[in-house]
A protein has these predicted regions:
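N-terminal intrinsically disordered, cationic/polar leader segments
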Residues: 2-112
Length: 112
């Protein structure tokens, strides 16, 4: 069930999600890529200069991701599964990012 989140809850949940992704990716492959979290915007830069950018979009209560593999995508929070689900399909933010990072780095990262 996807319902609009109360603003304070959204900010807390989105910030926590982005910070956790930053920590997990940095711990897993931070020696091979540049992971930077600043002002709530997560930038993952590959050696090629390509970037993944993940940030929250408060107006829509979504997390947005820009990926050099899958392009731009938006995610709503699904309370039933406690995950950020794509507005374009059944994929979660964690699944899409893990798949895209595997394509670009050859490393499979468990983000869930």
């Amino acid at each position: 069930l996807i319902v609009p989140l109360e603003e304070t809850f959204f900010h807390r949940l989105a910030d926590q999600t982005i910070e956790t992704i930053s920590d997990v990716v940095d711990d897993a492959i931070g020696d091979k890529i540049d992971v930077d979290l600043e002002a709530g915007i997560l930038t993952i830069e590959l050696d090629s200069g390509e970037q993944f950018i993940i940030n929250k979009h408060a107006l829509n209560r979504q997390i947005w991701m820009s990926s050099p593999v899958s392009g731009a995508s938006h995610y709503d929070y699904d309370e039933d599964t406690e995950s950020w689900r794509s507005t374009r399909g059944a994929t979660t933010l964690h699944e899409q990012l893990a798949a895209d990072l595997a394509v670009k780095t050859g490393h499979k990262i468990a983000l869930d």
